[in-house]
């Protein structure tokens, strides 16, 4: 469990219960971290826009990463941000992934985007793969995305997917494969809201999950 120490604490620990609550203890007493499940929900989502990350996004991106680690949540569509404690190394990897000449073996060229609200606050990330390999055709798709835990249920996922589809169209991708786990009802709803048509479900023996595979006509 991710800890958030403050000051020169003599003792630190965390508790996780049904409420997904995280605590730390320091010399000033017991403190309670935010419960992302009860974050303020907006009656209507702010408009968002996409842009590629740059050096000025260090603080926001790393804070985004910490939110996911704190609740042990998957960071889909982040180009493996969970594996990068070093922002500069992550940014360098994005540049390699975008250029077909430097894309690592076994991967496909892809572009990473930040989803930012009207105040330039980072609410999500989305990743557009420029083409499919066999694995992506079956389990991953052209697009992966995630919404910041504290910004969930604000309607951002539907906007993010729509905007990423526009980026795909700019690249000439007229038929977009997109996948989600069978149990992820919210993600399936987002895909259908953007024109997704379910083709079938595939069992992924590598992790024991059932994957729904959709196509979106993107002409």
What are these regions (language model features)?
Residues 178-188:
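Conserved beta-strand-loop-alpha-helix junction that forms the acyl-donor binding cleft
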Residues 179-180, 195-213:
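Conserved catalytic-core motifs of GNAT/GCN5-like acyltransferases
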Residues 168-179:
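Conserved GNAT acetyl-CoA-binding A-motif
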Residues 1-3, 201-202:
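Beta-strand-rich interaction surfaces with strong enrichment in secreted/lumenal proteins
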Residues 144-147, 153-166, 170, 189-193:
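Conserved acetyl-CoA-binding loop-helix of GNAT-fold acetyltransferases
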Residues 41-142, 167, 207-219:
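GNAT-family acyltransferases
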Residues 2-37, 125, 138-140, 146, ...:
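Short, compact, well-ordered microdomains
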């Amino acid at each position: 469990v991710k800890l958030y120490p403050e000051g020169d604490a003599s003792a630190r620990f965390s508790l996780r219960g049904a409420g997904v609550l995280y605590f730390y203890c320091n010399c000033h007493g017991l403190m309670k971290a935010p419960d992302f499940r009860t974050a303020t929900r907006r009656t209507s989502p702010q408009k968002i826009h996409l842009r590629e990350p740059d050096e000025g996004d260090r603080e926001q991106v790393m804070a985004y990463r910490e939110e996911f680690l704190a609740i042990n949540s998957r960071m889909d569509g982040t180009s493996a941000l969970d594996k990068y404690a070093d922002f500069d190394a992550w940014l360098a990897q994005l540049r390699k992934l975008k250029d077909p000449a430097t894309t690592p073996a076994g991967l496909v060229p892809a572009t990473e985007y930040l989803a930012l609200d009207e105040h330039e606050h980072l609410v999500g990330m989305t990743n557009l793969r420029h083409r499919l390999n066999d694995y992506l055709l079956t389990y991953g798709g052209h697009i992966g995305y995630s919404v910041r835990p504290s910004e969930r249920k604000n309607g951002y996922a539907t906007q993010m997917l729509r905007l990423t589809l526009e980026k795909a169209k700019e690249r000439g991708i007229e038929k977009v494969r997109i996948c989600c786990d069978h149990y992820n009802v919210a993600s399936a709803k987002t895909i259908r809201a953007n024109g997704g048509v379910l083709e079938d479900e595939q069992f992924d023996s590598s992790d024991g999950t059932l994957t729904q595979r959709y196509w979106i006509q993107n002409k």
